[in-house]
Amino acid sequence: MADFKEYAKKLIEIEGGYVDHPNDAGGITMQGVTLTTFRQYCGEDKTVADLRNMSYGTWCDIMKDLYWDKCLADEIENQAVAEITVDWCVNSGTQGLRKVQEIAGTKPDGIAGPKTLAAINGANQKELFDRIMSARNQFYVNIVKKNPTQRVFMNGWMNRLGRFKFE
């Protein structure tokens, strides 16, 4: 079964530090946690300074509770498939899980449950991983086609995808 701690090591490196880019639809982020998400999780009174000073423990709690656990990733048998699935959600919200569900051949409702797990775990893991990677690549291409201001993020998105390897 997949292990959050392994993914967390990779994710913290991918996400880096504080970002406040004017073209980023997510707005202000710290290590991949948006200010909006931080406030929803930690309290509406939290400030940008609080976000910037977020502890590693709080970051892990947010990533595990809001992304890893919502994808039921502890129950995904292959670490690489779990990571690429959860990472799409970290990077793109529930539409990431809907896309993975669609690729795995189950109802794309954005809610992980027994049918989603059965479809993911029942698939050829290498083929599923490759299909998710390909779909995610195309997802980013489509974002830029629809909104050329997002081109500034393309290299980062491709570098992010490049961090995931099937094992």
Name the predicted role of every residue range:
Residues 1-167:
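Cell-wall polysaccharide-cleaving catalytic domain and substrate-binding groove, primarily
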